[in-house]
Curated annotation (Swiss-Prot):
It is found in: Cytoplasm. Its main location: cytoplasm. InterPro entries: FAD-dep_OxRdtase, FAD/NAD-bd_sf, MnmC-like_methylTransf, SAM-dependent_MTases_sf, tRNA_MAMT_biosynth_bifunc_MnmC, tRNA_MNMC2, tRNA_S-uridine_synth_MnmC_C. One of its GO terms (cellular component) is cytoplasm. NCBIfam families: MnmC_Cterm (TIGR03197), PRK01747.1-2 (NF002481), tRNA_MNMC2 (NF033855). Catalyzes the last two steps in the biosynthesis of 5-methylaminomethyl-2-thiouridine (mnm(5)s(2)U) at the wobble position (U34) in tRNA. Catalyzes the FAD-dependent demodification of cmnm(5)s(2)U34 to nm(5)s(2)U34, followed by the transfer of a methyl group from S-adenosyl-L-methionine to nm(5)s(2)U34, to form mnm(5)s(2)U34. Pfam families: DAO, Methyltransf_30. Its EC number is 2.1.1.61, 1.5.-.-. It comes from Marinobacter nauticus (strain ATCC 700491 / DSM 11845 / VT8) (Marinobacter aquaeolei). It catalyses: 5-aminomethyl-2-thiouridine(34) in tRNA + S-adenosyl-L-methionine = 5-methylaminomethyl-2-thiouridine(34) in tRNA + S-adenosyl-L-homocysteine + H(+). Keywords: Cytoplasm, FAD, Flavoprotein, Methyltransferase, Multifunctional enzyme, Oxidoreductase, S-adenosyl-L-methionine, Transferase, tRNA processing. This is tRNA 5-methylaminomethyl-2-thiouridine biosynthesis bifunctional protein MnmC.
């Protein structure tokens, strides 16, 4: 258990175990019925919300949204997932179950695993949940499960904060949590008002409680409430429904192809995300294959430098790091190598920064931990002279191979050597013309072309996108001519473990250099700074910078060094309906791409967003314009 707790770490639930049933020490109540918790969940939440029939009748390529007021052990979620599979056995119909749940005191991973051992029939699903369970830090965590058919949005924090900041409309509510007499904050009128705000005609709810003030508060918000027999020895429970004169159905994902311009890691991740939701994608790039630009290196480190203050910017970065680690684990053994990663405090400035970072923040150890020089040496498998931060769930990626793997999907069609000349709106479609005369048509277009996005995206007269290219040169070190670490090591430069006889180190940061070819000076800079970071690397004296191999790529950065994902603003001068931007990922594209692809796919498909409104503002597109526009 975490002691001396500071943000962003969440206080985990303290459990008392009695005959295998977890009870909250804080609230003095059990998480599920001692008689049969699974049967209780099915009776109270699944059957009383009419979910079996509603799941079965849901259209292909549609989605269903359930919101819950207390995640607890995840039993309600797993039972609902199992019911979804029972009613929708065709895993190719591309319907999606969104399950949104809030938890103020989340279970520690070991407690979650122990609690779910009681349900052997749910074990395959429980195992997938456990393997994807996020670190206990405050914020919104999206878990993509069941091959993409199940999307769990798990909010660690206060229920009112979560409902105020999330954008979704629920089809059904599970009003769980502990009894109103034991956990009154969960049942405040403000919380019930938010339940109504996230509902629509036809939305249903169910709760184990039958307390009068809860029933009256929900009725005052417009729900038609009823008392029905409770489960087991419980006499009564409540159900409710917002009245409607007609059936309400969720929007279905369109069957028109979406064109994505740019086949780097951002475009590839988005193409894969949309394809797995049943959206056909045409992926176009000016190069002859994917990952030809900034995503073309043989090795890339998965890391961010988290801020000393846990503000919105830091929360977004932490959320992206955690999501990317979960995302890539699906491809472990293909292009993802979870070696772990060390961030060394190799300079006086970084030592001071890490000291202040550790004084002001607490992170769970499965996300990051402070290590001494001796501990860092043991982890790296080579002498390290300074302390640092250890990220056990990070590692390195083969970016070019990742791009190729991600776009290998039957719903993705690729068009290479497609050098975009114009992007114009004609007859309710966007027409993308290439310089060789070829053209593509689509109602929706995503520009994910790095720093070239600025010349491709339609903008109002007199406007331009505040994007800039930053040259980065990496150097390939022969493994036989130096000592290499067992894990990724980062500082002023980064160094990857050996792979296929070499390791990539770098990269330079050249704001005013447009040379596309590697230079001896760039290699020498990488070597010199690597020797300062890791003297024990023992680079052979016969290695000459002019004889080393390497690669140059141009990262795309915004004016504020924050990424961009969302629809292009429209000030009514020209129609930009259906044009989206995904760019400005900078040197951390491997971290940003999975989360922002998920968020943008949510927006495009009109599904609940994985980012709350506060974090979504950090990536909005309007801030890129010289005179900011609203989206």
């Amino acid at each position: 258990m975490i002691t001396d707790l500071r943000p962003p770490a969440m206080e985990p639930a303290e459990l008392i175990w009695q005959d295998g049933v977890p009870e909250s020490a804080r609230f003095g109540d059990v998480y599920f019925s001692r008689d049969d918790g699974l049967a209780e969940t099915r009776y109270v939440f699944i059957e009383r919300n009419g979910l079996p029939g509603r799941f079965a009748e849901l259209d292909r390529n549609s989605h269903f949204v359930i919101a819950e007021t207390g995640f607890g052990t995840g039993l309600n979620f797993l039972a609902t997932w199992a019911e979804w599979l029972a009613q929708r056995p065709d895993d190719q119909d591309h319907a999606i179950l969104h399950f949104i749940s809030v938890e103020r005191y989340p279970l520690a991973l070991a407690d979650l695993e122990k609690a779910l051992e009681s349900w052997p029939g749910l074990q395959p699903l429980a195992r997938e949940l456990i393997d994807n369970y996020p670190p206990l830090i405050k914020g919104t965590h999206r878990l993509v499960l069941g091959g993409g058919a199940i999307r769990l949005t798990l909010c660690f924090g206060d229920v009112l904060d979560a409902w105020n900041e999330l954008e979704f409309v629920a089809d059904a509510w599970f009003l769980d949590g502990f009894a109103p007499s034991l956990n009154p904050d969960m049942w405040l009128e403000k919380a019930i008002h938010q339940i109504r705000a996230h509902s629509q005609p036809g939305t249903t709810l169910a709760t184990f409680t039958s307390v009068g003030r809860v029933r009256r508060a929900l009725a005052d918000e417009g729900f038609e409430m009823a008392k029905v027999p409770g489960f087991g020895r419980k006499r009564e429970m409540l159900t409710g429904r917002l009245p409607t004169s007609e059936d309400v159905s969720a929007p279905t994902v369109g069957t028109d192809p979406i064109v994505i311009i740019g086949a780097g890691i951002a475009g590839a991740a988005l193409a894969r995300n949309l394809a797995e939701r049943g959206v056909p994608v045409v992926l176009a790039d000016q190069a002859s294959g994917p990952g030809a630009g900034a995503s073309g290196n043989d090795q890339g480190a998965l890391y961010v430098k988290l801020g000393v203050e846990y503000n919105d910017q830091t929360e977004l970065a932490a959320t992206a790091l955690s999501f990317s680690q979960r995302f890539y684990q699906r491809w472990q053994g293909e292009f993802w190598h979870p070696s772990g990663l060390l961030q060394l405090a190799a300079t006086d400035q970084e030592q001071d920064r890490q000291r202040r970072f550790l004084e002001r923040n607490t992170y769970p150890e499965n996300m990051l931990a402070a290590v001494t020089a001796a501990e860092a040496s043991r982890i790296a498998g080579m002498p390290v002279q300074c302390e640092g931060l250890w990220f056990p769930s990070s590692g390195w990626i083969q970016p070019a191979r990742a791009c190729q793997t991600l776009i290998d999907h039957p719903h993705i069609r690729t068009v290479f050597d497609f050098n975009v000349d114009t992007l114009r709106y004609v007859d309710n479609h966007w027409v993308i013309k290439a310089s060789d005369g070829r053209s593509l048509r689509a109602t929706k277009v995503v520009v994910a072309a790095g720093h070239e996005s600025g010349s491709l995206a339609p903008v109002p007269d007199g406007q331009s996108l505040r994007l800039k290219p930053i040259r980065g040169q990496v150097t390939r070190l022969p493994a036989d001519d130096c000592q290499l670490p067992d894990v990724v090591v980062c500082g002023t430069k980064y160094l990857n473990p050996a792979y296929d006889g070499s390791a990539i180190t770098g990269a330079t940061f050249d704001l005013r250099d447009d040379n596309p070819e590697p230079t001896p000076e760039g290699h020498q800079e990488n070597l010199d700074q690597l020797r300062e970071l890791l003297p024990s690397v023992n680079i052979s004296k016969h290695i000459q910078a002019e004889h080393l191999e390497g690669r140059v790529a141009f990262r795309c950065a915004t004016h504020d060094y924050q990424p961009v994902a969302g629809p292009c603003p429209d000030n009514n001068e020209i129609s930009r309906t259906g044009v989206y931007l995904l760019t400005g990922l900078g040197s951390k594209g491997l971290v940003w791409a999975p989360l922002l692809a998920e968020y943008l796919a949510d927006r495009i498909c009109q599904q609940p967003a994985c980012l709350n409104t506060r974090l979504a503002r950090r990536v909005e597109t309007g801030r890129l314009y010289r005179n900011q526009l609203t989206v």
